Amino acid sequence: MFEHDHGVAVSAPVAPSAHDGALTARMLPVDGMLLLEPAARAGCGKDGRAACHALVHAGIAVTEHFMRYSQVSSYGRNVVHGLHCQLPPCAQGRLMHCSRGAIWAVGVDVRTGSRSFGQWAGQTLSAENGHQLWIPPGFLHGLCSLHEDTEVICRHTRPSAPSCERAIRWNDGILGVDWPVTDRQAVLFPSDGQAPSFSNVIDWFFCS
């Protein structure tokens, strides 16, 4: 069981899917990642409390601080942002969804000892489908914007801490993430273009 006592803890094994009424939490192939799918599209993507209830129903105990730490970002088409994480004691779990446009979002397990270490899972999140992606602490995260004028809302279990931030190259050959854009199409932030290889990840997080 992987635990983090600042904002979130996985308190029980997650069933393949769990339903709280408004959102269904579906387990993804990479251990710990969840896709929240609305039972009815209207309003679900914007309802943070419904998302919290769905996570708790799936066995993830989210504290009240989860609602406080949110970030809204806007992107043009083909912008790639990632792969990023925050190290302990500031490790973040995050819940992502699109309020406008669409993104392809990805999480990569970098927890030493995890059965899915080095594996990734990606999902398309859009304002239309209302899907939300839960990426636990101990994961790299990234996204690619699929439309112009895309707006993304991320809720974090911990606030941003620049001293704890780390990055890995988005198209690292070891990870082999299957991005929806080519190297030539991708629009990168300067810092992301200079990020190191996945081989630099040495015991950033532990999974017991």
Where are these regions (language model features)?
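Non-catalytic, conserved peripheral segments adjacent to functional cores
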Residues: F2-E128, H147-D149, H156-S208
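Short beta-strand His + acidic residue motifs that chelate non-heme Fe in jelly-roll/DSBH
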Residues: L133, H141-L146, C154
